[in-house]
Amino acid sequence: MKGESFEDTIRMVSSYSDVIVIRHPQDGTAQRAANISSVPVINAGDGKNEHPSQTLLDLYTIQEELGSLEEKKIAFVGDLKYGRTVHSLTRAMKHFRAKFYFVAPDSIQMPQYLLQELEEAGLEYSLHRHYEEILSEIDILYMTRIQKERFEDPKEFEKVESAYRIEKEDIVGRCQEHMIILHPLPRVDEIAVSVDECKHARYFQQAANGVPVREAMIALAVGKK
């Protein structure tokens, strides 16, 4: 960019392409782009707001691994305040009558407006500081990294950066046989490498699922079936 406005950029790009895939650090930019674009816009993540394309591959992975999306017990662990993947997947799983467990320090716990949406939908949720207390109950353990780039105060990041880390011995024999571990990636220290060899670890398959899911999204956006 050479100083032009965001709106001008979108207008120009939409005249060159059949679809726009946008990732932007500011909340709401995908909607801003969609409002003025002459071609379909796919939101690949806007700030701390939403990440719907990730959610579609998450849903696909859950369906493939567990056989259905209905009434699953899902625990989100880590940065829930700024984690856009968590926000989007929570809203999606709401339609399948999931039960939610939100595991995080108070300073990065789930935003109140999303908790209110769950209450209005009549869905169960609970807040926790430690995932160990609910590990035996859940179908899905959804880990996230603590995102340094989301913190304005470095001291606040330092307080929570190592809040959660799972090791192989934390999982094996302590969870249900069918439980799966997901992560939007990249991981930092929140999942030990030793966990990779567990049958519960499905985050690399989850990432691989992103290729066909996103291909399908683009195909639908440009009118192909």
Regions found by a protein language model. Give the residues of each.
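Phosphate/diphosphate ligand-binding glycine-rich loop within oxidoreductases
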Residues: 1-63, 189-191
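Gly/Ala-rich phosphate-binding loop of Rossmann-like dinucleotide-binding domains
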Residues: 14, 90, 94, 196
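General beta-strand structural signal in soluble alpha/beta enzymes
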Residues: 21-24, 41-45, 76, 127, ...
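Short, acidic/turn-prone active-site loops that include or flank metal/cofactor-
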Residues: 45-50, 105-108, 206-211
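Glycine-rich phosphate/diphosphate-binding loop of Rossmann-like nucleotide-binding domains
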Residues: 64-143
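Rossmann-like adenosine-cofactor binding region
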Residues: 119-195, 200
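C-terminal helix-to-coil terminal segments
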Residues: 197-225
